[in-house]
């Protein structure tokens, strides 16, 4: 989520929204398709640590989940705040917040969609960097061990280590990612797919740039997963500085080229990739065409891409946010036209996508 978006939300989130609860569940799903075609349903990462449910933050409603399931999306990337789920480092998870997380997961499962758990913290806890004295790697590993135990070996739940590590040395982030992954595989005994970002907001366009030490593309090649079931997560926007804040698509060709270059890196190293965030305004043909071009890169290279989740939607998103594809009273947002071919065409099902354990 961008700085601009956070400012909009801070002003807009003044009223609570009641969550629609669903008690229905289904047995652990063998996913309908082998590739993720998903949506970020934002809301549980809103506000400050603590906060009141349905006043300061919310989890996705039944209405919203059902809408995106009806459009063919098969995955929800589910952002939330680490500090709410674990109010004290190295201590048990908060029972009430775990309950809300579980309700959201079951609500999504009821529509036969997968869930990506996304601590949306930019490699920070209460403002302090992971791998620092105040938030040591052991604390990050402890958090993931506790969280992973909730869904260990339930393969419709995927573990996204962290949203957009930012302004953190790559060596520091790599150590933290390795320790968290070791805890997931060891202490939690979980073999779920893990999504691993780089630093510098994990941009595809900057994957080979030495921004915080070595380039992501050099350092993250040393990432270690004892379970060997992971994919590298990148984000990519199309505006002037690739931040998603400028409400234009001036760098659309560069954004598509960035995904193509990342595809080559994945293939060269024998890795899998995942496009966790991408989005653009819906009011211009150029933007719609560029979004489709980005989706096409992932769909045309299923030997290395596990799929994508569009940013953004959610019950509390303001209608003025141009990347938002939460439906309006008038109907669908125009960006769906770029995503629809991939949502409806599953002709390659089971053939070309990397297998998910």
Annotate each predicted stretch with a short phrase.
Residues 28-30:
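Boundary of Sec targeting at the N-terminus
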Residues 32-210, 215-217:
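Active-site mouth of glycoside hydrolases
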Residues 57-58, 142, 149, 153-158, ...:
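Extracellular glycoside hydrolase catalytic/binding regions
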Residues 22-24:
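N-terminal signal peptide c-region/cleavage motif recognized by signal peptidases
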Residues 163-164, 308, 314-316:
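Histidine-bearing beta->alpha loop at or near hydrolase active sites
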Residues 330-357:
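C-terminal functional modules
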Residues 115-117, 273, 308:
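Hydrophobic beta-strand scaffold residues
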Residues 2-13:
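Bacterial N-terminal signal peptides that target proteins for export
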């Amino acid at each position: 989520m961008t700085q601009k978006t956070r400012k909009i939300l801070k002003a807009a989130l003044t009223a609570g929204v009641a969550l629609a609860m669903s008690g229905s569940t289904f047995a652990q799903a063998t996913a309908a398709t082998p590739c993720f075609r998903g949506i970020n349903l934002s809301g549980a990462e809103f506000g400050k640590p603590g906060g009141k449910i349905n006043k300061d933050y919310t989890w996705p409603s039944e209405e919203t989940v059902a809408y995106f399931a009806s459009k063919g999306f098969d995955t929800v990337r589910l952002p939330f705040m680490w500090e709410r789920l674990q109010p004290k480092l190295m201590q048990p998870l908060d029972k009430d917040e775990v309950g809300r997380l579980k309700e959201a997961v079951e609500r999504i499962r009821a529509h036969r969609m997968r869930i990506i758990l996304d601590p949306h913290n930019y490699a920070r806890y209460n403002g302090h960097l992971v791998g620092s004295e105040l938030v040591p790697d052991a604390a990050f590993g402890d958090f993931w061990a506790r969280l992973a135990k909730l869904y260990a070996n339930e393969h419709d739940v995927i573990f996204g280590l962290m949203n957009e590590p930012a302004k953190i040395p790559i060596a520091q982030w790599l150590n933290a990612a390795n320790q968290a992954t070791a805890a997931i595989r060891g202490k939690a005994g979980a073999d779920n797919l893990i999504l691993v970002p780089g630093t510098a907001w994990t941009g595809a366009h900057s994957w080979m740039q030495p921004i915080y030490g070595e380039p992501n593309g050099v350092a993250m090649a040393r990432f270690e997963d004892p379970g060997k079931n992971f994919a590298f997560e990148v984000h990519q926007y199309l505006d002037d500085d690739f931040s998603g804040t400028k409400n234009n698509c001036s760098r659309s060709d560069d954004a598509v080229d960035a995904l193509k270059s990342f595809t080559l890196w994945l293939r060269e190293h024998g890795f899998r990739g995942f496009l966790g965030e991408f989005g653009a305004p819906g009011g211009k043909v150029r933007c719609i065409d560029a979004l489709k071009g980005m989706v096409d890169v992932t769909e045309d290279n299923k030997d290395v891409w596990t799929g994508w989740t569009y940013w953004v939607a959610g019950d509390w998103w303001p209608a003025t946010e141009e990347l938002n594809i939460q439906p309006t009273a008038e109907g669908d947002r125009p960006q769906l036209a770029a995503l629809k071919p991939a949502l409806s065409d599953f002709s390659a099902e089971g053939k070309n996508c990397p297998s998910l354990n």
